[in-house]
From Swiss-Prot:
Iron-sulfur keyword on record: no
Entry keywords, A to Z: DNA-binding, Repressor, Transcription, Transcription regulation
PANTHER family (alphabetical): LACI-RELATED TRANSCRIPTIONAL REPRESSOR, RIBOSE OPERON REPRESSOR
Keyword Transcription annotated: yes
Record-linked InterPro entries: HTH_LacI, LacI/GalR-like_sensor, Lambda_DNA-bd_dom_sf, Peripla_BP_I
Name of the protein this chain belongs to: Ribose operon repressor
Organism the protein comes from: Pasteurella multocida (strain Pm70)
Domain of life: Bacteria
DNA-binding region: 4-23
Free-text function comment from the UniProt entry: Transcriptional repressor for the ribose rbsDACBK operon.
PROSITE patterns given in the database record: HTH_LACI_1, HTH_LACI_2
Domain HTH lacI-type: 1-56
């Protein structure tokens, strides 16, 4: 493991200069700072746990890494996290990775340099281990499906059950030709919801149509493009499970552009229950993710980890619930052809 002495030797500066650059504790010229930080990156250096423990006091600051802050779901979760940080007299530094691994690495280093007391992670598309691959010795909590992370506190939403619940509700309303618009299936979150969809169809003895599985992205544009493919299917599905409310909103626009109506021509159920869902026309039936509970549990779990870093790691599972509105119509049961 690299040390400050190693960095100083390679950068040809003093150890104290390296310390000032890393801790941002004194003015250092841009030329020397760039040279030191280049070596820091090359050696994948992060301050050791021992060095951090020698701080006089905590900074009362938490770092939050998210995949995308322009997604309404993440925005609402971040708001909840900030609220609970404030209640515990902690500051929050938000960092957006945009799904870029190099940006994730860079932003992590920035947060470490700011001496945050711990990290909250919402980067489900990451394929690296924070503790192992990036040599991070900070307390951290994973707030979503981060499949490669083993030794961490984790708070998951039961996505497979949520996908099952959404599909089952459509089936109970008489729908048998049901399409699904997923996010990127390389993400565990998207795959889990698809697994729930398949489980509900199998349980109801409804044949799986592979052409009804539309892989897209968890955003408005993904919903628009995904719904265009759904409406081109023959026979056309009577209902769609949109794997996020953002996907559902994009799907709404495509339906409107094609002169169709929800739910008369096609039913839609979303996932997340973001604030805008109830203001759509018609109001969106969706699966509620307990966003406030997620934010509260994440902050409380991280603060416990900061106080007791050697405690056994915990995994908490939150259960989604159906929120019934007006975007799904009741169909008469029909024999499948």
């Amino acid at each position: 493991m690299a040390t400050m002495k190693d960095i100083a030797r390679i950068a040809k500066v003093s150890t104290s200069t390296v310390s000032h650059v890393i801790n941002n504790s004194r003015f250092v010229s841009d030329e020397i700072r760039d040279k030191v930080m280049h070596v820091v990156k090359e050696l994948n250096y992060t301050p050791s746990a021992l060095a951090r423990s020698l701080k006089v006091k905590e900074t009362k600051t938490i770092g939050l890494l998210v995949t995308a802050t322009n997604n309404p779901f993440f925005t609402e979760v971040v708001s909840g996290v900030e609220q609970y940080c404030h209640q515990h007299h902690y500051n929050l530094i938000l960092s957006n990775t945009e799904g870029d691994t190099e940006r994730l690495r860079h932003n992590l280093q920035t947060l470490i340099q700011k001496q945050v007391d711990g990290l909250l992670l919402m980067c489900s598309d990451a394929r690296i281990q924070i503790g192992k691959d990036l040599n991070v010795n900070l307390p951290f909590v994973v707030m979503d499906w981060w499949p490669t992370e083993e030794k961490a506190d984790k708070i998951y939403e039961n996505s497979e059950y949520g996908g099952y619940l959404a599909t089952k509700q459509l089936i109970e309303k008489g729908h048998q030709h049901i399409a699904i618009i997923t996010g990127n299936l390389k993400k565990s979150l998207a795959q889990n919801r698809l697994d729930g969809y398949k489980k509900a169809l199998k349980e109801a003895n409804i044949p799986l149509r592979e052409d009804c599985i539309i892989e897209s992205h968890f955003d408005f544009e993904g919903g628009k493009r995904g719904m265009e493919k759904v409406l081109a299917l023959q026979p056309r599905p009577t209902a769609v499970f949109a794997c996020s409310d953002s996907i559902a909103f994009g799907a709404y626009q495509t339906v409107w552009h094609q002169g169709l109506h929800i739910p008369q021509d096609i039913s839609i159920i979303g996932y997340d229950n973001i604030t805008l869902a109830e203001y759509m026309s018609p109001p969106l039936t969706t699966i509620n993710q307990p966003k406030a509970e997620l934010g509260k549990l994440a902050v409380e779990t991280l603060l416990q980890r900061i106080k007791n870093p050697t405690a056994k790691h915990r995994t908490l599972l939150l259960e989604p619930q159906l929120v019934w509105r007006e975007s799904v119509r009741q169909l008469y049961q029909e024999k499948r052809g």
